[in-house]
Amino acid sequence: MPELPEVETVRRGLEPALVGARFTTVHLARPDLRFPLPARFAARLTGQRVEALSRRAKYLVADLSSGDALIMHLGMSGRFDVVFPDGRQLSPGEFYLEGAPGQAKHDHVVFALSNGARVTYNDVRRFGFMDLVRRAELETCRHFAGMGIEPLGSDLSGEAVARLFRGRRTPLKAALLDQRLIAGLGNIYVCEALHRARLHPEAAAGTLADAAGRPTRAAARLAQVIRDVLTEAVAAGGSTLRDYAHTDGTQGAFQHRFRVYDREGLACTARGCRGRVRRIVQAGRSTFYCETCQPAP
């Protein structure tokens, strides 16, 4: 499943095609994706101008001139294909490499735009979804209600980490993946951030706050490396794995910078470290960490 950097890569690729243009027609190949599409979905979109395209956690949000917001989630294999009037083609979000995701039979929603562009949503596994909500109700809608802070930007700090994790006995990795605390973090980038912060994934999350609730040095370090890892991943166009390639058909490159993720048994890449990467399973997901850099609690 695409994580925050991959979704941000998609947003940046779609923005030039969508923002400022109106939907002239919306073709639905089926009435549902992962969930049924909203009632009168095509009719509510047709004629509306896209005023902005943003990202919240792993969701894309298009602000429309009608006051609605179009929420889009890529699921496991969703992607967008853009064709411009001059014939140029762009696939911002072509991270899916398994099989032939570009087959027309998997084209589920086609947006024709007033600037002459055509944007097609293609989804092999059909785990993605789209919804329409009033923009004024965006933060309280079922998708975003109770969602945590954004890890990119000023909201994430050592103080925020201490406040969110104080008193929690849950493993640190599980706390970082809890979307009610910090929204948008996924397995890959949590493993990478914990390694850079030299924190064991099974350490209690509450240890990042002292007895008075103040952030420890580890909390400040973790907040910084989370931002660093995500920023580097966005700049690299995300990570291409078995399921996932990148804007205009090229592949994301951050997987070549993995320090621990999917490197079980290999030597740690940290300078001066002679440890090896280990893999454990937490809540059904693989966790990768260095046995030396990230000592057990």
Curated annotation (Swiss-Prot):
Belongs to the FPG family. It comes from Methylobacterium sp. (strain 4-46). Its cofactor is Zn(2+). Monomer. This is Formamidopyrimidine-DNA glycosylase. CDD domains: EcFpg-like_N. It holds the Pfam family zf-FPG_IleRS. It catalyses: Hydrolysis of DNA containing ring-opened 7-methylguanine residues, releasing 2,6-diamino-4-hydroxy-5-(N-methyl)formamidopyrimidine; 2'-deoxyribonucleotide-(2'-deoxyribose 5'-phosphate)-2'-deoxyribonucleotide-DNA = a 3'-end 2'-deoxyribonucleotide-(2,3-dehydro-2,3-deoxyribose 5'-phosphate)-DNA + a 5'-end 5'-phospho-2'-deoxyribonucleoside-DNA + H(+). The gene is mutM.
